[in-house]
């Protein structure tokens, strides 16, 4: 039982260690072989969420991201600038395996699959510390799953080393741009188009709600020219924010 009266503030505490119910559920749901190596990781994230992540959130909540449309010369930039505290949290979460693939990779090295209850526990702790970041940091694993399942080999070779990088500086985070003004769940009304141009596709349209708007690898939906009406004419695309030559990929943020 948690005696809340002994806490002046939750910030500065380990949010795994002070949560007996979370510890109980991990012992109950995890195989003992997994629990032995995963509990130290859970404890590490508990200290991270209860410490620097929660402390930074007190500051970053008062400093919203800033959209910079143009550079000093008037050329399109469309860059989202974050408070340094938000970037530090993003880095810490990636390195700890909350948003990055480190724990999945470690489980694979052990010949295991990472139990689904573990990401749930990590997100449970993060949601109490920095709820505003929970959506964006959860996008990368979804994009990884789509690339592994649907992308041709040459696309996988280009994207997967970055999407699965364990170190933040080498990593590309994922995003999902799906919702349009015509409706969030009615994909049959999607209006974004895709036109073939040699070995590339040119997408034209607008998305209304973008999860992790400034991420590097964007999963999105568009309707190829000549495609069928309704859902059967919708296709899935993977869009890099930056082209191979380092140039801006024509994505405009409003």
Question: Model segments located where?
Answer:
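Internal maturation/activation junctions in enzymes
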Residues: 151-192, 196-199
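Acidic, glycine-rich active-site loops and adjacent beta-strand->loop/helix elements
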Residues: 141, 149-151, 162-167, 180-183, ...
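Extended, charge-enriched "interface" segments that sit outside catalytic cores
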Residues: 1-112
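Buried hydrophobic positions in well-ordered alpha/beta secondary-structure cores of metabolic enzymes
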Residues: 143, 176, 194, 203-205, ...
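Short Pro/Gly-enriched beta-strand edge/turn motifs at strand-loop
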Residues: 172-178, 202-203, 249-254
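Short glycine-rich loop/turn motifs
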Residues: 120-123, 173-175, 189-192, 217-218, ...
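Internal helix-loop-helix
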Residues: 76-170, 211-213
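A short core secondary-structure module
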Residues: 200, 204-251
